[in-house]
Amino acid sequence: MSGTPRRPASGADSFHKPEPEIVGPGTPGFPEQEEDDLHRTLGVERFEEILQEAGSRGGEELGRSYGEEDFEYHRQSSHHIHHPLSTHLPPDARRRKTPQGQVRKPRRRPGATPAGETPTIEEGEEDEDETSEAEGPVSHTDPSPASTPTSVQFFLQEDEGTDRKAERTSPSPPAQLPHQEAAPQATKKAQPDALVEEAIMVSGGTAGGDDGGASGRPLSKAQPGHRSYNLQERRRIGSMTGVEQALLPRVPTDESEAQTLATADLDLMKSHRFEDVPGVRRHLVRKNAKGSSQSSREGREPGPTPRTRPRAPHKPHEVFVELNELLLDKNQEPQWRETARWIKFEEDVEEETERWGKPHVASLSFRSLLELRRTLAHGAVLLDLDQQTLPGVAHQVVEQMVISDQIKAEDRANVLRALLLKHSHPSDEKEFSFPRNISAGSLGSLLGHHHTQGAESDPHVTEPLIGGVPETRLEVERERELPPPAPPAGITRSKSKHELKLLEKIPENAEATVVLVGCVEFLSRPTMAFVRLREAVELDAVLEVPVPVRFLFLLLGPSSANMDYHEIGRSISTLMSDKQFHEAAYLADEREDLLTAINAFLDCSVVLPPSEVQGEELLRSVAHFQRQMLKKREEQGRLLPPGVGLEPKSAQEKAFLQMVEAVGAVEDDDPLRRTGRPFGGLIRDVKRRYPHYLSDFRDALDPQCLAAVIFIYFAALSPAITFGGLLGEKTHDLIGVSELIMSTALQGVTFCLLGAQPLLVIGFSGPLLVFEEAFYSFCRSNELEYLVGRVWIGFWLVLSALLMVALEGSFLVRFGSRFTQEIFAFLISLIFIYETFYKLVKIFQEHPLHGCLASNSSEADGGKNTTWTEAAPTPGHGNTSSAEQAGVERPQGQPNTALLSLVLMAGTFFIAFFLRKFKNSRFFPGRIRRVIGDFGVPIAILIMVLVDYSIQDTYTQKLSVPSGFSVTAPEKRGWIINPLGEEEPFPVWMMVASLLPAILVFILIFMETQITTLIISKKERMLQKGSGFHLDLLLIVAMGGICALFGLLWLAAATVRSVTHANALTVMSKAVAPGDKPKIQEVKEQRVTGLLVALLVGLSLVIGDLLRQIPLAVLFGIFLYMGVTSLNGIQFYERLHLLLMPPKHHPDVMYVKKVRTMRMHLFKALQLLCLALLWAVMSTAASLAFPFILILTVPLRMVVLTRIFTEREMKCLDANEAEPVFDEREGVDEYNEMPMPV
C-alpha cells in the first residue's frame, strides 16, 4: 500500500464540530483558536501536496506488472515495512501516548542481517510491533525540537484554552514534566530510525499546576456515567470510537475517509492488509515457544504488556458435542434448546415426546458441508481465547464479529443478548427440583459479573454497550483477577440420575463442544464464529452435564438467507465428533488448518444419489464402501511423509511419537517362538509369568472377582456332574461323579498355584469322554483291567509331555487351522446329540408305554408284581438313587417313566437354551439379563429337579453319588490303583502298548489346551502378564498322569469355561458411546478365583444328598444343550445351511463374496468326507484311534487342499475371523468365538 494519505471529502465531513456547551468559562476566543489550529494542521497546501503525489502515481502504477527487479527493490527499500495510513498524518496527530510517570524504553533492534536478505524478526517482536500500531501509530521521521510539540492533546479540557494561550504568548521552552526530567537526554538523539519520543498525557493544566505531577490523571474529565479513554478502544475501528466525547478529534474516522476513496484504492488497501502476495512479503517470522501471534490478534485483547502468554499444550481429548438451536419456548420467549448430541454417534431429540432417539451415524447433506466450509473461510476464528465465563467469551466473539465486518455496530447488543439467552435440555422438565438452567446473562449479573450499584437486574439488556455507562470489558478484565463467586444458596444441587447415567457414557477427561445455531431477523446476513478456548472451562447452565468446554461454534443469520442453519450445525457437530477432525482442531494454528481438515473429511465421505431406497438391503454396499474409504484413510495417514499433514508442534508431542515408534519397533515377545535350546520355551514361560506371582493375589481384591467365583463355580460344577453321570453309565461306575469332582478340585488347585495362565479352567470335556468310552470298550473286549491300563497310559503321557516341552513343540498348534478345528467340534457336537437321543430311546425300551386296557387293574398289578418283586419298592421310591440300591436290579417297565424322562430332558434343554437367548434379548436391564443368562444351566437343573421331586409316584433314574468322601463304587475299586494289576497281573505287552493310546490322549489334551490358550491370549483381550504354553501343557499332562494312579481322570483346558472365566474377569469401560461397542478397560489377571472355584467344586461332595436327587434325564438335557450350542460359530455348520438357500439369500460374508458357490460347496464336501470317515472309525472297534485320524486332517489341509484351491480362496474359506465377544448382540455369545468342542 502506498504511503500517500487519501484525500478526505471536506473538513466538515471528516471532523466533528465541537460542542459549544462544553467550553469552559474564561476562555474567550476559543473558536478562533480552534480554527487556526485546523488550518495549521491540515491546510489546503497539505492536501494539494497529497493530491499531487497521488496523481503522479495515477493508474500507471496500479496497472503495471512487477518483475523480479521490483521485488528486489521492494525488499531493499523502506516500502517493505508496513506503514499504516495514520503514519502519513501530521506528527502532532499521531503521537504515541505514554502514561505519566513512565519513561519510554528504547526500542530493541534485532541483530544485523546479511545484505540482500529479508531481516527475520522474532515472533514476540512482531507482536510488540502490532501492539504498538494498535495503541498508536508511530513516526519514522527524526524528531526535532522545532517541529515536535511538547504535548499532544487528544481531548480538550475545560482549561485547554488557557494552556493554549500560554503556549502562543510565551517564547520560553515548554515546561518539563516529571517523567521527562527522568529520561536521559541522550536517548532522544540516538538511533535516528527509532520510534518517536513518547507522547505526553494532558494533565488538565500546565506542568507547574497544582496536580501537574499526578501520574494517574486521565486524558479527559469523564462526565458522570462515562468512563475514561482506554487503549483497549484502539481495537475497534475508527467509526466505533466514542467521538462524541471529544471536542476536537484530530484524526478522521474510517467511514468518512473511506467515502472519499476510489474502488481501486480500497482494493489496494485490502490487498496490502489481508493478502499474502508471493515475492512481496513482510518480514519473515521465526516461530518460537512464545505462542501463536494469531491468538493475540484474534483470540484475546492485547493486555498491558506486549508479550503474549505461552501457548498451552493442546493434547487432543475425547469430545462431547451438543447442538443448541435458537427456538421459542411455550411462552414465545427465545431460548437455546438442545436438539442433538454426539458422543460418537448422533442422538436426536424427538420433537413430539421430548426424549432421546436411538444413536445412529449422522447423514449430512453435501451442500451443508460446502456452506460450512465457506462460513469457516470467511467467518471469525478465535484460537486460544483466554476467557473463563460465557459472558466473557460472548463479548470477545461479538467484538471480533464487528471488527471483521460480519455485523454492524448497532447489532452488537442484540447479538450479545442472543448469545446469553437461557439454555434448556430435554431432561430439565423431568427433574422435580429447582431448575438449573438459569440465563447466563441474568445469573452472571446476579453473581457479580457486573458490579453495578443500580437497580438494573440485567445490564446486558438494559444498559447501552457503547458510551454512557461503564464498559463490561473492564469488568471482564477485573474478573480474571478475582476468584469465581460462589453461587447463592439454593441454586446448586446434586447431579440427577440422568446426568450420572450420561456421564458414565462420556469418556474420562473429555472436553465439550457447544454448537449454537439459529435464525435472528435483526441481522442482514449470516455471521459465524469458531472459538477454541485456551483452557477448557465449565460454563454454567450451558451443557446438560458438567463437562468442560473447549470449542464453541456460533452461527446466526436471517431466515431469508439461503442457508439451513440446522443442517450446518449438524455438520460441524459431526465433524467435531470425528476423531481426525477434532484432533486437527486441537492442533490448528490458523484458519487454513481447519479448512484442510474439512477437505480431508470430504475425501472420505460418501455421497448417496437422490434415489428412493426401497429397503435396507440396498444400503449394504454403502457400509462396505465406507469401510474401504476408512481403511484407505488410515493407510494414507501411515504413509504420509515427514512434513505433510499435521505434524507435532511441541517437544512433548514429538517425544510421545518417538516413544510410540520405539515401542512398535520392539519385537513382540511371542511365547511360541523357539529358542533352539532344550526346555528353552519352558524357561521363558517361567521368567515371563512368575515375576507377577504376588500381584496375582493382590489383584484379586476386587468385588468383581467374588462375583466371578460364584458364576464360574456353577459353570464348572454343571459339566462335572453331567460328564460324571455319563461316565458312570459308560464305565459301570468305575469312574463317576465322585472321581470327576475330586480330579477337578485337585488339579484345579495345583494349576492355579503353579500355572502360567490362571484364567484357564481345567475340566473334563467331550473328546476325553469319547476316548474314555472307547478305551473302556477296548479293555472290556480284551479282558483287560480298565483302571490299570489308565495308569500305564498316564506314565507314557508324562514322558510324551516332557519330550514335547523339551523340543519346544508347542509351536505346532499354529498348524491346526480352522479346517481341523471345525471338523473336531462338529464331530463332538454330533456325538453329544446322538448320545442324548440314544439314551432317551434306551429309556423308552426299558420302560415302554402301556396301552389302555379294559381291566387294567389286575393286569397292571400283575405286571407290577412281576417286575418289582426284587426291588421292594416303597411309596418314595421315585426319590431313591441307584447307589442306594446297589446290587439290586433297576426296575423295568415302569409306567410314565419314559414320558417323564422326555419331559425332564426337553424341559432342561429348552429352559437353558431360552435363558441363553434371553441374555442378549431386550427385556429387563442388561445387568439382570446377564445374571439370568449366565446361570441358565443351574436354573434349568433346579427347576427340573423340583418338577421331578413333585411327582412322587413315577420312577426316574437318579444320579449315582456316594455318601461322603468315597469312590462311586467302593465294592469295585479303591482310591489307589496297583500298576501291576488289581485282580490279576497286567500283561507286560500292554504296558508297552499303552504308548499308543497315550499318544492319542496327548493329541486331544494338546489340541484343547493349546488352542484354548491361543484364544485366551488374543491381543484383543489386552492381557498384560502373558501366557505360558509350555509350562501349562507340562503341568496339565503331568497332573493327569499322576492322578491315574488314584483312579482319577486326566483333564484339559475347557474352552467354553475358560473363555467364560476370562469374560467374567474383564472390566469393560463404562464410558461407551451409545451405539458403540464396549471396550476393554482391564482384565483381572489373578489366581484366586480359579483357586476358590476348584475348592468349592471339591466341597460339593458334601451336598451329595442334593446331587442324588438329580435325574439322569436332566443331565441328558444338559448334554443336548452343550451339543446344540457348540454348533454356533462353526462356519462348516453355517455353510451346510447354504445348500438349502438360493444364492440371492446368501449372507454377506467373505467366503460367499470372494469364492464362487461351486468352489465353496467343494470345500464343504471335503469337510463332510473327513467327518464321515471319523464317524465310521468311531463306530468300529478301532474307535480308540479317532484322534490319530483327526490329526491327519492337518497335513491334508496343508498338502492336498492347497493344490485344489487358490491361496485367496483358502484365506477366505479357512480364515480365523473369530473375535472376542463382549457386546450384547442377539444370538451371539462366547460360543461364537471358538470352533472348539465343549
Curated annotation (Swiss-Prot):
Post-translational modification Phosphoserine, affected residues: S132, S144, S170, S172, S239, S439
Main subcellular localisation: membrane
Biased composition (Basic residues): 76-85, 94-110, 280-289
Matching InterPro entries: Anion_exchange, Anion_exchange_2, Anion_exchange_CS, Band3_cytoplasmic_dom, HCO3_transpt-like_TM_dom, HCO3_transpt_euk, PTrfase/Anion_transptr
Catalytic activity: hydrogencarbonate(in) + chloride(out) = hydrogencarbonate(out) + chloride(in)
GO biological process: negative regulation of CD8-positive, alpha-beta T cell differentiation; negative regulation of CD8-positive, alpha-beta T cell proliferation; osteoclast differentiation; regulation of actin cytoskeleton organization; regulation of bone resorption; regulation of intracellular pH
Protein name in UniProt: Anion exchange protein 2
Organism: Cavia porcellus (Guinea pig)
Native organism taxonomy: Eukaryota, Metazoa, Chordata, Craniata, Vertebrata
